[in-house]
Amino acid sequence: MAHIELPAYGWTPRALQRKAWSALEHGCKTVVLAWHRRAGKDEVALHNAAIKAMQRVGNYWHLLPLQEQARKALWESVNPKTGRKRWEDAFPAEIIEHVDNQGMKLTFKNKSTWQLLGSDNYNSLVGTTPVGMTFSEAALGDPAAFAFFRPILLENDGWSLHISSVRGRNHFYNLF
């Protein structure tokens, strides 16, 4: 396989994103980002997952509150700046072995997987073994989802990234 540079397509973090990006690069196990709208929270998360999936073979998940939100916001949505689907900005074709459109799942040539899911249906994921999880729009998601997966991440020496805009004093506010 040819040498592939990640982050893909020359992406670099914006000034606001640099401190968080550094924490992710240095292996922080739990990162919470309470950023304003349009700050690039999912952008950082996608590029982080791409790198982590190449560094360690495992299952990586990106959860939004509802699976349909994940499909619309990240699987089907086209980045107007690049003309690529948002997930394609972080995961170049050269590292992908298979794309499952129905399951919103990528299988990479090194056998890692990355999948978009809804945190509202976390009970359907019993028996799974993620090593990296992003909880996007975490302020709107089911707080029980992270509580459910936290022991699995601890056992697997995994990591979690919680990203959202603050939406009042709720579970995300307390996490932050």
Task: Give residue spans per PLM region.
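Phosphate/NTP-binding elements of NTP-utilizing enzymes
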Residues: 1-176
